[in-house]
């Protein structure tokens, strides 16, 4: 991948140097929202906000698997039962 455009289409990161992608939950207007964020060039950046946590995780995983690390294996820690 050569660039990421933020959800609101205000910013495009060309060839970003990404160290971390993650999801955090945040209450906005009394509603729980899930933000997909990235550490790009050592700065925290909001990429998008979603009302469903599973959608946020799916977006984050799509960015990792399809765009940045291609064939690199990623281990996901199992859910607590």
Region roles according to the model:
Residues 1-81:
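Eukaryotic intrinsically disordered, low-complexity regulatory linkers and tails enriched in Ser/Thr/Pro
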């Amino acid at each position: 991948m050569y660039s990421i455009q933020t959800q609101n289409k205000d910013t495009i990161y060309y060839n970003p140097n990404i160290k971390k992608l993650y999801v955090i939950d945040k209450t906005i207007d009394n509603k729980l929202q899930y933000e997909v964020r990235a550490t790009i060039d050592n700065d925290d950046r909001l990429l998008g906000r979603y009302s469903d946590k599973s959608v946020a995780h799916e977006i984050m995983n799509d960015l990792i698997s399809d765009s940045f690390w291609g064939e690199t294996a990623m281990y996901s820690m199992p859910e607590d039962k």
